Amino acid sequence: MDARLTVLTAFPPAAGIDNEEYYQNSQQHAKRVRELVRDNAQWIRESADDILKHVNPAVYSLSYLMILEFLLQSPGWTSQQAHESLASYMAQFFLQFDARQIRCKGSTWSDVLKEAYSERGLFPASVAVELVTAALLRLDPSGSIITSHHCNLVELAYNTGNVGALLPLIEKPIIYMPAKGMSTAQPLCDMSLPPPAYINPDSQLTDALTSAAVLQYDFLCGLCFIERRMWQQAFDAFERCVTYPTRDGGCSKIMTEAYNKWILVGLLLTGKPPTLPETTSQAAKKIFATQGKPYKLFAQAFKSETAGDLVREFEVINSELLPNEGNVELAKLVLAHYQRWQIINLRNIYTNISLEKIQERTQSAETGAPLPTVEAVDQLVQSMIADGSLQGAIERPKDGSPAYLTFLSSPAQGMSEVEFSAQVNKVMQGIKALEPIIEATNKRLASNREYISHTVKRQFDAAREHKLGLQSAGGGFEESSFHIEEEEDLMSGLPAH
């Protein structure tokens, strides 16, 4: 065997060494590989295929990664054939790499990963989204921390129509934000570390994030979920934008755009106007109350028993707002669901109801009138039963009397004792799985001076707002006090006051 190949396969060491020694070995190995690449550049360019076939990316991930980095920077690998070979090797690497080794060389891993989704075009967008999604989940299987790669990837996936491959990543709940100064005294290769301890700007597994980038990520996630008709996930994503904590009680433009979409998606999801969470800042609530008023009126009209009110409000916002904000199709979908929710809500009054009576008691917001025939009602109800939005069955009496809809109990109401117990156990297991995350978060927050200062300021601001509210009960507010904040550096931590 070529002695140079021996250098590439000298790491990782045999099992049995502790994390500190493993990390030190990784740094020494990276230095030797760097020297090998520098002194044997021509050999690597000419023999890259043979070298990478010999170096298993799942076992010798660090060496494989550093060879990939060299080839990406090499002017000799610019032909179409070379690009295809390089893309093949990169795909193998991102699907197989050893996450423990990669933690020891975060900057190189990030640089190579960026090439997978860059405009350089080594991969078609569909392949790039699938590969980068797999790589990020391989680095952090919990998917609990957002990175700069998440932000770039969701934009690529949405803009190129490759949302499906992204879902395994964006469906993961984000718990952590990466920040400078989060590194631990423990070696990065310690597999017991929580994600923020090894994924942060210091380890270079992510770049620094701004508040604008995080808001954009959640907003695009919401759009991706809308595209897939995943209403609960879309609603949650937009709500994260709406309730985003900003410095000095500000509110960004993207938050107001998210608020409008949040209202529309909320109507589709629950059939009624959503209520702002308590965590929404007072400043944001004031801005939403004015800039989002047309959408709020549209949502209130959704509760009307006649479709005419909803149609009129739709015409108002369609002429002024919907086209400019990209909400035309979403609002039209709300119109289409108006009658569906009227039918669903009949279960609050009836156990069963004839299709003729459904025709009389419900209206289409698309036409502003009841459906023209009982057959049309029959088709609508059957489609709702088929897609799972309506728990019911159409009964057709043998004596020829009119067909009727029987409402069935929801799956939760019809659970047996055994099924209910299994559901409780599942919830308890989920809570138990969160315990180490909560413990790690509490430890970090308890020792974070900026967080403590921020908490004290929030309490002070809340008390001040309450006092001002008592003093000016019934009064208005000054629109000039609005602060539209476009960007805030999250890496600098929360402001000290």
From Swiss-Prot:
Residues of the signal peptide: none
InterPro entries in the record: COP9_N, CSN3, PCI_dom
Keyword Nucleus: yes
Keywords, comma-separated and alphabetical: Cytoplasm, Nucleus, Signalosome
Gene name per UniProt: csn-3
GO biological process annotation, one example: ubiquitin-dependent protein catabolic process
Location of this chain's protein in the cell: Cytoplasm; Nucleus
Species for this entry: Neurospora crassa (strain ATCC 24698 / 74-OR23-1A / CBS 708.71 / DSM 1257 / FGSC 987)
Protein name in the entry: COP9 signalosome complex subunit 3
